[in-house]
Amino acid sequence: MQNYKQEFIKFALSRNVLRFGEFTLKSGRVSPYFFNAGLFNTGADLARLGEFYASAIQASGLNYDVIFGPAYKGIPIGTTVSVALFNKFNLDKPVCFNRKEAKDHGEGGNLIGSPLQGRILLVDDVITAGTAIREAMDIIAANNARLAAVVIALNRKERGKGELSAIQEVERDYRCDVLSIIDLDDLMQFIENEPEYSQYLPAMKAYREQYGVA
C-alpha cells in the first residue's frame, strides 16, 4: 500500500470521518465501517484532504485539462485539490463548479470558474448510487467536453442492487476510470496490521464476502 493511502486512513480515523463498528446504511445493510467526508470541515482538514487527492491524482498519471467539482460536496474538494496540486506539484490547473440552480443575472448560467472544456477530471467524496455523477455528465456533455476520469476519497467496492457496484456502472456507462484515494481492500489491509483495529477484520471480511465486487 502506498504511504499516502496509509496516512489518509490514519487522518480519516483521527477526524472520526472513518469509524469501525456497526452502522445501518440507507440501503438497510449493516456495515462494519462508516465514512463521512463532511467531517473534514476545518481549514487544516481541507488542506490535508486536498493533498491526499493530489497525491492520488499524480500517482495515477492522469491526463486532464480542467478540475470539475460538482455541487455541493465537490465544490470545496475541487478547490482544495487545485490548490494542493499547485503547492505540492507545481501544477496550475483550472477549476470549475456548478450551481444547482442557474442564475439569470450577473455572470449568469450554472457554471462558475474556468470554462468547462477539454478533458475533465471530476472530483467528489464518494459514489453511492451514481446519481450525482450522471447529473455532472449531463453538464460536461452540454459543454462539449469529455470526462477523463473521476477521483473520489473512498471506493467501498460494494454491489448495488445488481451485480455491479455504482462505480463499475459509471465506468461501464461512461468508459472512464474511477480512481480513489483508498478502497475497501486498503482498509482491510490497514486494520489487519493495526492491533487497535484488528478486532474488526472478521466483520470486514464477512461484509466483503457478502456484498463485495472484484
Swiss-Prot record:
Tree of life domain: Bacteria
Residues annotated for 5-phospho-alpha-D-ribose 1-diphosphate binding in this entry: 26, 72-73, 99-100, 103, 105, 124-132
Pathway in which this enzyme or protein is active: Pyrimidine metabolism; UMP biosynthesis via de novo pathway; UMP from orotate: step 1/2
Keyword Magnesium: yes
UniProt: orotate binding residues: F34, F35, T128, R156
Any GO BP: 'de novo' pyrimidine nucleobase biosynthetic process
EC number from the UniProt entry: 2.4.2.10
Requisite cofactors: Mg(2+)
Keyword set includes Cytoplasm: no
Keywords from the UniProt entry: Glycosyltransferase, Magnesium, Pyrimidine biosynthesis, Transferase
Leading EC class: transferase
Classification via InterPro entries: OPRT, Or_phspho_trans_dom, PRibTrfase_dom, PRTase-like
Catalytic activity annotation: orotidine 5'-phosphate + diphosphate = orotate + 5-phospho-alpha-D-ribose 1-diphosphate
An annotated GO cellular component: cytoplasm
PROSITE patterns tied to this protein: PUR_PYR_PR_TRANSFER
Pfam families: Pribosyltran
Molecular function as annotated in GO: magnesium ion binding; orotate phosphoribosyltransferase activity
Disulfides per UniProt: none
NCBIfam families: pyrE (TIGR00336)
UniProt function note: Catalyzes the transfer of a ribosyl phosphate group from 5-phosphoribose 1-diphosphate to orotate, leading to the formation of orotidine monophosphate (OMP).
Family named by the database record: Belongs to the purine/pyrimidine phosphoribosyltransferase family. PyrE subfamily.
Subunit structure: Homodimer.
Name by which UniProt lists this protein: Orotate phosphoribosyltransferase
Organism: Mannheimia succiniciproducens (strain KCTC 0769BP / MBEL55E)
Organismal lineage: Bacteria, Pseudomonadati, Pseudomonadota, Gammaproteobacteria, Pasteurellales
Gene name, Swiss-Prot/TrEMBL: pyrE
